[in-house]
Design a protein with these regions (language model features):
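Surface-exposed loop/turn elements that mediate protein-protein interactions on large endomembrane-trafficking
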Residues: 1, 35-42
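Beta-propeller blade termini
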Residues: 5-16, 20, 41-84, 91-92, ...
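Structural motif
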Residues: 29-37, 87-93
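Gly/Ser/Thr/Pro-enriched helix-cap/hinge segments flanking short amphipathic alpha-helices
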Residues: 55, 66-72, 79-317, 324-358, ...
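Serine-hydrolase catalytic core recognition
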Residues: 135-137, 506-541, 545-547, 552-559, ...
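Short beta-strand and adjacent turn/loop elements
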Residues: 360-368, 410-414, 437-439, 524-527, ...
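Long C-terminal appendages of very large multidomain proteins
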Residues: 568-570, 575-630
Length: 640
C-alpha cells in the first residue's frame, strides 16, 4: 500500500506494539494506513467510515479523567466544517495483538515548563521507542510486555534520569514526581580537588571556576576566562601518607571537559596565629594579581541586618556552615539567581582604630548559574546578574556603590580578601553588600592588620601522576538550602548522569611531562576521569618553631561545560590556548600548529570519548559493550 499523492499522513502507535504506524484520510473512509510501517512485518489497515471528512488527520491521546484507566488514541478530522473525533478500533484490524501502554507526562523546571526538547527513551524487551518531547503527554506502547524495563529522560540541559520496571498503565509524573520532574541539581561548575587527610581523600572545593570557556553573561557578551588559580588547602586537610608523600586527586565529575596545563604545590610555613589566603575570586579584568594575604588580627561585625529585616549577626561571626539567606532564591530557568538583596554590616570603630590597612575577608559559596540562566536573565526584565557590590551611605543618606563589584568566591567554600581601606569610613564603619546572586556567606570579617607577616614557601613538583578512569563520586545531599553540595570520594555512584564530550582526550597513565610548564601541551580530561598526583614530602624542610604549615595548589587551565547556550560547548574542540583573545577565539586566530604541538596531539590525544550511559536501543547497546570491552583491554588497568 502506498501513501496517496497529496495525502497528509499522521504517525503514531495505534496498536501499542511499540512500532510507529502511519495513516491518512482517504475518500469514503476515515483512514487507511500501515501498522509497523518501518518494519518488514508492516500490515495495511483501513478504519471507520466518515463521509465528508477532509483535511489533515491529527492524532491525540484521550484525556481520560482517570489516568489509570484504559489508554487510547483518537483521530481528529474536519467534517462539514466541524472538528470531529473518532477512536479507531484497531482491535478489529489486529485481533489479540493490541499491546500495553504507559502514560507519560513530564514537567520541566530548569529549561522550560513543558520539557520541550527532552529526549525520552522507552525500552521494554525488544521494543524501543525514542521520542523528542513536544511538551504534551504521550501514550507509549510497549507491546505484549507488562512493564517497561527502563524509561530514560535526557533533559534539554543534558541531565539524564531513568526509572526501572515501570508497569503498564502507570501515569509517570502522576505516580512518581521525583522522576517526572526535571532535577535542579549541579550540572556544571568546574573540576574537583580532593586531598589525603590521613584517613581518606577529603573534598576541598571545585577549582578553576574562574576559567569558564564560552560562558555568556548575555547574548554576545562572554566572560573572559582567568586561566590560573591558587587553591588554599589547610594543613589538617593534607597529610603525609605512609609512603612519605602528599597525595591529591583532581577529578572531572560534572558535564564538562577540563584542559589542565600546570600543577604545582606551594608549601607555606607561616607564624602561628596568622592565617593565609590566596588573592583569588571570580572577577572581571583586571584579574587579581598573584599574592598571599596574611591575616593576624580581625574585627567581627557587631551587628548584621538583612534586607529581609532579620538579624544575621550570629551567622557571620565565623566559619561554621551557617549562612544568612536574606533572599528568595529564583528556581527553574533562573537557578543561581535571587531577588535583589543586601546585608548591612556595622563594626565597632574601636576595632579599626590605628589600622593602616583594612581588608574585607569574606568566606562563602555561590550556587553556580550557567549559560542558559544568564541568557534567560538577560532577556527577562527585572531579572539581573549583579555580583556583590559594597555600598556606603552618601551625604543624603542614600546607599551608593563605593567602587566596582567585588567579585565572589569561585567555589565552595572559599575566601576572598579585598583592600577596602579607602571605601569605608573608619569613624562609622557601616556598609552593605548587595547582590542578586544565590550566594551564601559563612563569615564576613575585617582584617585590621598589616599584610606583612613573614612566611616561607617551598614549591614541590609532582613526582608522579596517573590519569585514569574512575567514575563519579556519590554526592552528599545537603539538608538545608544554604548548604553546598559536597562529594564522598569513598563512594562512586552506579548511575552516571552524563557522557563525555565527543572528541579526543589524553591517554591514560603518567602525564608528568604535560604538567611541568605552561605551554598549551595540557591534559584533556572528561567526565569520570581522575588525575592522581604525588608530591615528595621528604624533600620538605621541618616546620620552624612557632610556625604552622598550610598549602596552596597552583593550577593553570580551563574548563568548559556542555550547556546548550555555552559557546562551542558540544565537543572537546576547539582547543583553548594561552595566546587567544577570548573563547571562542577570533576567525584570524587558531590553535598553535607547530611541529611540537602536532607531536603532542599525535602522541597524547589518542583516547576517544567514553559513553558512561548504556544505550537503550539493542543495536547501540551491543556497540557500547564492544567498545567498553575494547577500552578495558587497552587500558590494562587493574586493582583500582
Amino acid at each position: 500500500m502506498a501513501v496517496p499523492e497529496g495525502a497528509q499522513p499522521a504517525v503514531d502507535d495505534l496498536d501499542f506494539d511499540g512500532a510507529l504506524d502511519i495513516f491518512w484520510p482517504v475518500a469514503g473512509t476515515s483512514g487507511a494506513g500501515l501498522l509497523a510501517a518501518g518494519l518488514p512485518t508492516r500490515t495495511p489497515i483501513t478504519f471507520g467510515a466518515l463521509e465528508g471528512a477532509s483535511g489533515p488527520m491529527l492524532v491525540r491521546e484521550i484525556d481520560a479523567p482517570d489516568p489509570y484507566g484504559a489508554l487510547a488514541l483518537e483521530v481528529l478530522q474536519i467534517q462539514n466544517g466541524e472538528l470531529i473525533a473518532q477512536s479507531p478500533d484497531v482491535s478489529t484490524l489486529a485481533p489479540n495483538k493490541i499491546g500495553q501502554a504507559i502514560y507519560l507526562k513530564f514537567i520541566g523546571k530548569k529549561d522550560n515548563r513543558q520539557g520541550v526538547g527532552a529526549v525520552v527513551e522507552v525500552r521494554s524487551g525488544n521494543v524501543y521507542r525514542r521520542i523528542y518531547w513536544r511538551g504534551r503527554s504521550e501514550v507509549v506502547g510497549i507491546g505484549q510486555q507488562k512493564w517497561a524495563d527502563v524509561i530514560r529522560v535526557t533533559w534539554p540541559n543534558g541531565v539524564v534520569q531513568q526509572e526501572l520496571d515501570v508497569e503498564e498503565g502507570v501515569a509517570i509524573m502522576l505516580d512518581n514526581p521525583s522522576f517526572g520532574e526535571q532535577p535542579e541539581g549541579l550540572i556544571g561548575s568546574c573540576p574537583f580537588l580532593y586531598t589525603w587527610n590521613g584517613e581518606t581523600f577529603e573534598f576541598i572545593s571545585d577549582v578553576l571556576g574562574i576559567t569558564p570557556l564560552g560562558l555568556p553573561l548575555a547574548p554576545g557578551m562572554l566572560v573572559p576566562p582567568d586561566h590560573d588559580e591558587y587553591v588554599l588547602v589547610r594543613g589538617d586537610q593534607l597529610k603525609v601518607d605512609a609512603n612519605g608523600e602528599l597525595v591529591m586527586q583532581f577529578t572531572e565529575e560534572l558535564r564538562e571537559v577540563t584542559y589542565l596545563d600546570r600543577v604545582r604545590l606551594d608549601v607555606i610555613d607561616h607564624p602561628e596565629g596568622t592565617d593565609i589566603y590566596p588573592n583569588e575570586r571570580f572577577a572581571f579584568p583586571p584579574f587579581p594579581e598573584p599574592h598571599v594575604h596574611t591575616v593576624s588580627r580581625i574585627a567581627q561585625p557587631k551587628k548584621v541586618t538583612g534586607s529581609d529585616g532579620r538579624d544575621w549577626t550570629a551567622e557571620l561571626q565565623g566559619n561554621d556552615m551557617h549562612h544568612p539567606a536574606p533572599f528568595e532564591r529564583l528556581a527553574g530557568q533562573f537557578l543561581g539567581l535571587a531577588e535583589p538583596h543586601w546585608l548591612e554590616l556595622e563594626f565597632d570603630p574601636a576595632d579599626l582604630a590605628g589600622a593602616k590597612l583594612i581588608r574585607l575577608v569574606a568566606t562563602g559559596w555561590f550556587f553556580w548559574s550557567d549559560a542558559s540562566v544568564n541568557v534567560a536573565a538577560a532577556g527577562t526584565p527585572g531579572i539581573d546578574f549583579v555580583p556583590p557590590t559594597l555600598e556606603v551611605q552618601n551625604a543624603d543618606g542614600q546607599w551608593v556603590p563605593a567602587g566596582p563589584p567585588l567579585g565572589f568566591p569561585a567555589g565552595k567554600t572559599k575566601t576572598m580578601v579585598i583592600d577596602i581601606t579607602s571605601m569605608i569610613p573608619k569613624g562609622n564603619p557601616r556598609f552593605r553588600i548587595s547582590s542578586t546572586l544565590e550566594l551564601y556567606w559563612d563569615s564576613i570579617l575585617l582584617a585590621v592588620c598589616d599584610d606583612d607577616a613573614e612566611f616561607k614557601t617551598t614549591s614541590l613538583e609532582p613526582v608522579s601522576s596517573d590519569l585514569w578512569s574512575r567514575g563519579f563520586s556519590e554526592p552528599i545531599m545537603p539538608d538545608r538550602q544554604d548548604m553546598p553540595l559536597f562529594f564522598d570520594w569513598s563512594k562512586t555512584t552506579e548511575e552516571p548522569r552524563w557522557d563525555q564530550h565527543p572528541g579526543l582526550y589524553t591517554r591514560y597513565g603518567a602525564v608528568d611531562e604535560l604538567l611541568e610548564t605552561i605551554d598549551d601541551r595540557y591534559v584533556i580530561m572528561g567526565s569520570g576521569d581522575a588525575l592522581t598526583l604525588h608530591f615528595d614530602a621528604t624533600a620538605l624542610p621541618a616546620v620552624p618553631e612557632g610556625y604552622t604549615r598550610d598549602y596552596l595548589v597552583f593550577l593553570d587551565g580551563w574548563a568548559k561545560d556542555r550547556d546548550p547556550n555555552t559557546y562551542e560547548a558540544l565537543e572537546v574542540e576547539p582547543l583553548p590556548f594561552h595566546g587567544m583573545s577570548g573563547y571562542p577565539y577570533r576567525a584570524d586566530e587558531s590553535f598553535p600548529d607547530s611541529a611540537e604541538m602536532q607531536a603532542w596531539r599525535k602522541e597524547w590525544n589518542t583516547r576517544p570519548s567514553h559513553r558512561w550511559i548504556v544505550p537503550l536501543s539493542t543495536e547501540r547497546e551491543t556497540q557500547w559493550v564492544r567498545e567498553a570491552i575494547s577500552k578495558l583491554k587497552a587500558s590494562e588497568r587493574g586493582g583500582r
